[in-house]
């Protein structure tokens, strides 16, 4: 059955691919991306759904199932409501008669005012009360009472357990009173008021010991039992609790008086010269650890600590003394001052030592103003940022070259990209920003930087070469950055291209093609003749449409520095890609330690532009120095603020660098002592761009080993200067490496005068190979042995004043005079030395071949026996290869 792509269906229908994708999702079709395929039936159903709104693709039995599943939910809700009502009915029926009677009396008094009915109800009330009190425990457990009633009953039970004999006469009197007269509601209120007034008088007349409060509390409960007015009595209970608090305050006043008396005595003792003894001092010393424990106890919950924090800042955060923190670090083998920075491991160890819960936050990379766009500012659509990644020589730059219709790839030395190139391309009236990253293994940081600023990553894989190491690394960078991934299968025009094998290799590492049920687009292309490139661009636009990429055009401009260099005639320049806001010519900007004012903005074609909008790519001039690649480039209000932030950042980085030099562990001290035996190669590196400089430094530092260490004494972006020559001349065996830079005439003359060697390169392969060769020459050579021959001892001759001569038969190879020899007896090496004399009959011989007899005498060794074996060998020295 023929299948139709969703994007092609949308074009025929005259709609956008995103609209068709959303409608297909509403219908329930199994589509994952806007470029997924549809069958003829699905396409017909989607066409009908868009035109009429009728979903004919979903079968009827699914709707029935949905309705049936909804019905039991209603039934359950009804049953739950009915069960709740039944519970409420049970509660009302099981409540006690006294309360219901009480409610009916109050209602009848207010509404009707008929005293005969009230008297009957009040007469019934005391008669029912004792019956309910004498009921068994089983009945009480089954009864369901209201929460207010249970509180009153609990209070009555507690009191009656303490005072059981007083309850019986009161009950009898109640019965007699109920027979004689049933009091009205107003009379009951009046009686309770009189009793409260009398009781307050008694309380005022007897303000005695605190134990009396328990008697008063029993009295309140008795009154509440007689008056049947629980709400008012509960308030009285609260008042009595306030009396207890007054007693506590009074105790505190007495304690304060005692403390004042003690302090007066201490002042008197201090003036007494006979009291200045060690006992008082010891007491003062003992209080110090109590203070520290109190401070530590105050900290509750996890403490958020930034990753790059100084020792004194850590002590302030955890509210501990600085000396204690330094002491713990010293015990762990780290000598640190208060201004040294703590790494993640040290923070975790300190938290364990001080028994704290901490959460380590990532340190902010840039110490500049946070750019917060206005909340009310509208978010406008921006072009997608696409990064092209992949292995070396898989055709990344050739693909971009075909898209831009220019010959950039031929301009790169060795045909490999060594910088990040950023370009703008227009397709179907829409712009796309492309970032080309190098594929060489030395440029890992550049690839990760390109993946972090992008929206869509195109991984170029050669169909004839398959998945390589840098391909896997690029895929992991893109996946970690959480961006859309499109895999372009390049070099499809070659005969040995095998796309199925490539798909299988990608599926093994977790990148399954869309056709195989995965979520990744695999597009066959040929950067040489342009096959499939248009399809790739359309896929990029469809992905961008689905992502709904938007950015604010208001607020401070914010960008990322992709590459920076020092150009002659322009000074420090930086290639940036905008993230938000609009950058204009003349804006004050800051990027890491660099600051300045935007003098000019140049697009990828070298033309001047006045402003740069989000996702735009341009080269900025006017900076004070070359910023580091990956730095945040941001506009500020004026030049003063820009300079302040750049200076703060420079000071912070300097302190961090000094911290690394001062903070030394005991193990590192031992290594520094042992490094006196190490051979070092001092180097000065100058490169044309910041990214290339970082890559070269990282690659060279990996070459250091146990015998040889590379010491980079100077580095920078720009040409080789005379100051570099003088610095190189001060250190022995030093070397200047230039990458894409050339020394001028005066620099060459000074280098020749001071005997400084300068090596320049345009390909990173050649630079690394030469440094490896230099390091191999500094390393101790490898000594290998080569066996030349063997001879068996057949007879020995002892000659006075000469020594022992062994008569031998050469059984393997040849025996040479002066060569090194081992004497082997019963398979064990007895002696190692050299042959001092070799004779054939009576004549001296230089060499005796296999099958001939000869006489052999060793230097300074005469212990030779019949049956011993002479084994001759040569030592061959070879240089180590890194």
From Swiss-Prot:
Regions of compositional bias (Basic residues) in chain numbering: 199-211
CC terms in the record's Gene Ontology section: cytosol
Region called G5, residue ranges: 526-528
Major site of localization recorded for this protein: cytoplasm
Residue sites binding GTP per the record: 390-397, 436-440, 490-493
Domain tr-type G: start-end pairs: 381-550
Annotated spans, G3: 436-439
Region (G2): 415-419
Region (G4): 490-493
Segments of skewed composition (Basic and acidic residues): 104-115
Keyword Protein biosynthesis recorded: yes
Family: Belongs to the TRAFAC class translation factor GTPase superfamily. Classic translation factor GTPase family. IF-2 subfamily.
Job description of the protein: One of the essential components for the initiation of protein synthesis. Protects formylmethionyl-tRNA from spontaneous hydrolysis and promotes its binding to the 30S ribosomal subunits. Also involved in the hydrolysis of GTP during the formation of the 70S ribosomal complex.
HAMAP family reported in the protein's UniProt record: IF_2_B (MF_00100_B)
Protein name in the entry: Translation initiation factor IF-2
């Amino acid at each position: 059955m023929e299948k139709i792509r969703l994007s092609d269906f949308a074009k025929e229908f005259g709609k956008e691919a995103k609209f068709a994708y959303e409608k297909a999702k509403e219908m329930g079709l199994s589509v994952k991306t806007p470029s997924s395929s549809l069958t003829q039936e699905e396409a017909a159903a989607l066409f009908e759904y868009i035109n009429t709104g009728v979903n004919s693709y979903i079968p009827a039995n699914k709707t029935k199932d949905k309705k049936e599943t909804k019905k039991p939910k209603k039934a359950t809700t009804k049953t739950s409501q009915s069960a709740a009502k039944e519970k409420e009915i049970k509660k009302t029926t099981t409540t006690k008669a006294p309360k219901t009677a009480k409610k009916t009396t109050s209602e009848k008094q207010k509404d009707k005012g008929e005293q005969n009915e009230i008297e009957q109800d009040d007469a019934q009330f005391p008669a029912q009360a004792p019956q309910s009190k004498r009921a068994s425990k089983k009945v009480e457990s089954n009864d369901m009472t209201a929460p207010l009633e249970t509180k009153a009953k609990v209070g009555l039970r507690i009191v009656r357990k303490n005072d059981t004999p007083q309850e019986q006469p009161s009950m009898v009197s109640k019965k007699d009173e109920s027979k004689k007269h049933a009091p009205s509601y107003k009379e009951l209120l009046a009686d309770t008021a009189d009793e409260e007034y009398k009781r307050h008088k008694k309380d005022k007349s007897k303000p005695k010991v605190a134990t009396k409060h328990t008697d008063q509390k029993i009295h309140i409960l008795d009154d509440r039992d007689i008056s049947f007015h629980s709400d008012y009595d509960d308030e009285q209970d609260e008042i009595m609790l306030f009396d207890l608090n007054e007693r506590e305050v009074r105790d505190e006043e007495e304690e304060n008086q005692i403390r004042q008396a003690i302090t007066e005595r201490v002042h008197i003792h201090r003036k007494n010269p006979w009291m200045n003894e060690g006992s008082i001092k010891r007491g003062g010393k003992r209080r110090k650890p109590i203070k520290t424990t109190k401070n530590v106890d105050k900290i509750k919950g996890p403490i958020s600590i930034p990753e790059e924090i100084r020792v004194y800042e850590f002590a302030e955060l955890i509210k501990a003394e600085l000396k204690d923190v330094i002491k713990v670090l010293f015990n762990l083998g780290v000598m640190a001052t208060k201004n040294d920075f703590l790494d993640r491991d040290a923070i975790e160890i300190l938290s364990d030592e001080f028994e704290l819960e901490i959460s380590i936050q990532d340190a902010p990379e840039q110490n500049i103003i946070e750019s917060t766009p206005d909340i009310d500012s509208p978010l406008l659509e921006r072009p997608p940022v696409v990064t092209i990644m992949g292995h070396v020589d898989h055709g990344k730059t050739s693909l971009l070259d075909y898209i831009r219709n220019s010959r950039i790839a031929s301009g790169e030395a060795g045909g490999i990209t060594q910088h990040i190139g950023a370009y703008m391309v227009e397709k179907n009236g829409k712009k796309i920003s492309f970032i080309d990253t190098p594929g060489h293994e030395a440029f890992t940081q550049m690839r990760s930087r390109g993946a972090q600023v992008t929206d869509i990553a195109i991984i170029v894989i050669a169909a004839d070469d398959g998945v390589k190491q840098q391909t896997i690394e690029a895929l992991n960078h893109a996946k970690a950055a959480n961006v859309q991934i499109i895999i372009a299968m390049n070099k499809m025009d070659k005969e040995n291209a095998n796309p199925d094998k490539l798909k299988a290799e990608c599926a093994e590492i977790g990148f399954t093609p869309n056709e195989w049920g995965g979520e990744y687009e695999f597009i066959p292309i040929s950067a040489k003749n342009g096959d499939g490139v248009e399809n790739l661009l359309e896929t990029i636009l469809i992905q961008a449409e689905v992502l709904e990429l938007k950015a604010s055009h208001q607020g401070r401009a914010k960008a990322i520095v992709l590459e920076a260099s020092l150009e002659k005639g322009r000074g420090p320049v930086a290639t940036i890609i905008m993230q938000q806001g609009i950058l204009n010519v003349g804006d004050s900007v800051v990027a890491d330690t660099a600051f300045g004012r935007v003098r000019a903005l140049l697009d990828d074609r070298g033309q001047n532009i006045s402003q740069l909008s989000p996702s735009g790519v341009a080269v900025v001039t006017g900076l004070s120095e070359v910023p580091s690649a990956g730095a945040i480039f941001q506009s500020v209000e004026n030049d003063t603020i820009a300079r302040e932030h750049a200076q703060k950042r420079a000071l912070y980085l300097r302190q961090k660098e000094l911290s690394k030099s001062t903070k030394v562990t005991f193990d590192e001290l031992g290594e520094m002592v042992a490094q006196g035996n190490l051979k070092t190669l001092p180097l000065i590196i100058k490169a044309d761009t910041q990214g290339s400089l970082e890559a070269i430094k990282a690659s060279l530092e990996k070459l250091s080993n146990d015998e040889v260490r590379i010491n980079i004494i100077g580095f920078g972006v720009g040409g080789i200067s005379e100051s570099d020559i003088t610095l190189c001349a001060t250190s022995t065996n030093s070397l200047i490496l230039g990458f894409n830079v050339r020394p001028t005439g005066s620099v060459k003359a000074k280098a020749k005068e001071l005997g400084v060697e300068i090596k320049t390169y345009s390909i990173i392969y050649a630079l690394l190979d030469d440094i490896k060769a230099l390091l191999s020459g500094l390393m101790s050579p490898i000594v290998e042995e080569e066996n030349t021959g063997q001879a068996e001892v057949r007879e020995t001759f002892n000659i006075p004043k000469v020594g022992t001569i062994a008569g031998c038969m050469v059984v393997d190879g040849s025996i040479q005079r002066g060569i090194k020899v081992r004497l082997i007896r019963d398979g064990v090496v007895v002696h190692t030395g050299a042959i001092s004399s070799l004779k054939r009959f009576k004549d001296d011989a230089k060499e005796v071949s296999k099958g001939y007899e000869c006489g052999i005498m060793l230097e300074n060794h005469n212990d030779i026996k019949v049956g011993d074996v002479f084994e001759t060998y040569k030592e061959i020295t070879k240089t180590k290869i890194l």
